[in-house]
Regions:
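His/Asp/Glu-enriched, well-ordered alpha-helical/loop segment
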Residues: 57, 61, 124-127, 136-184
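Glycine-enriched alpha-helix->loop->beta-strand junction motifs that scaffold or abut catalytic
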Residues: 77-82, 98-104, 122-126, 150-152, ...
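Structural recognition of alpha->loop->beta junctions
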Residues: 73-93, 150, 172-184
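Active-site environment of divalent metal-dependent phosphoester hydrolases
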Residues: 27-32, 66-73, 88-91, 112-114, ...
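Divalent metal-coordination and catalytic microenvironments
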Residues: 17, 21, 55, 65, ...
Length: 184
């Protein structure tokens, strides 16, 4: 894909009047090829920038599936408005969130079974569990750091992932309290 193709895709999607454009900037736990490296970058910075510029020119916000620090950095440096999931943030990443006035949507529910369930229950491989723990911890630490720095954090469930249904938002709220230490 080229930057111009990315712009073209955004224009095509915009014809259907979506609420936003969502980019899949990284992979995740299930497609990781290396233990300890979930969230492999799937989009170049140039593609992300082109898609974001086009979406913003059309009045659309851009959300991005991101599950690695590199992915968060590429997303924020190139115009993404909201990080879906998240990853272990550095001080530079927190500064990017602030500079861009971006936010995070934490999704603990889909990562939790991979990270914390017994493998006899989750039926995941040892590598998927290991990488799931990295992603889960990254989402939690990203949310904590964002909150500590006045960056808005929303909650989502990532419905459709294993063990996640359309009516599981109550679990997400419970996990947010339990793992991020947030209450009302």
């Amino acid at each position: 894909t080229t930057p111009e193709q990315a712009r073209s895709y955004v224009r095509q999607i915009a014809k259907d009047k979506p609420d936003l454009i969502k980019l899949m900037i990284t992979g995740g736990v299930l497609d990781a090829k290396v233990k300890g490296e979930p969230g492999e970058l799937k989009m170049s910075p140039e593609i992300v920038k082109a898609a974001c510029e086009e979406a913003h020119a059309l009045g659309l916000h851009v959300a991005a599936h991101v599950e690695s620090p590199q992915g968060v950095q590429v997303a924020l440096e190139n115009g993404v408005d909201t990080i879906e999931h998240g990853a272990l943030p550095s001080e530079a990443i927190i500064q990017l969130f602030q500079d861009r006035k971006a936010c995070q949507v934490a999704t603990l529910s889909p990562a939790l079974p991979f990270a914390l369930f017994d493998r006899h229950v989750s039926h995941v491989s040892e590598m998927e569990q290991y990488n799931g723990k990295i992603v889960f911890d990254g989402i939690v630490e990203c949310a904590k750091a964002c909150l500590a720095n006045g960056i808005p954090v929303g909650l989502g469930t990532d419905t459709g992932c294993p063990y996640i249904t359309h009516y599981d938002m109550w679990r997400e709220v419970n996990y947010f309290h339990k793992f991020c230490g947030v209450s009302n």
